[in-house]
Amino acid sequence: KFNLLELTDGMDEMLGTFEMEAGQYNQLRFLMDMPELSQGPPSNPECYLMINGEKEPLFVPSGGQSGYKAVGAFQVPSNGTVELMADWDARKAVVETGAGHYILRPTIRLVAEGEAGSISGGITNIPDDASKIIVYAYEDGDYESAEADEPAEEESRFPDAVTSDEMGEENGYKLWYLAPGTYDLVVAKNVNGSFDSVLGIVEDVKVESNSNANAPIDISELSTP
């Protein structure tokens, strides 16, 4: 069993190894021991959240039948191996339904570990009323202001973000396991534990394979979203 909330800040666990035919692939599916929402809450769920010391079952649509889809292009070489990272963002993946159930949305992504890069930096000029600063990575040009709107039921805010990170104790952030490319960083503020506003954007951060892009964030100089 894995506690996914412990696998943060670049920590990972091996899920397993298996053989595949050489070629290009675009997704994997994980068959998970999770109940269907139509089955009702199980008495002893294998996949669950701990809320106020109590187990709350975590449902996944078709997770035990068609599988939980992880998306990302990768190449399996002939007579070779490829290491994949399945990156899971709790801020997007877990949502509460109107009936008080928790479901796992299909937001996991795959990155070939040998190709992955990262973005990190310090954050300065933080608003006094901010309880949290969250940095979201978007593929270049993908962010629209509607991403920050109040989400519909069973949806999450910032749904098209590639990944995200919360500012740490030393006022820094790091966005792990990014495919090579250009990204925009959307900086959001939480007040008293809830989303408050988007503070601005850092545009055109370039990520290369096996390297870290340094992108310090001065909130007073952010571009207007």
PLM features: what roles do these ranges have?
Residues K1-P225:
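A short, solvent-exposed, low-complexity linear motif enriched for acidic/polar residues
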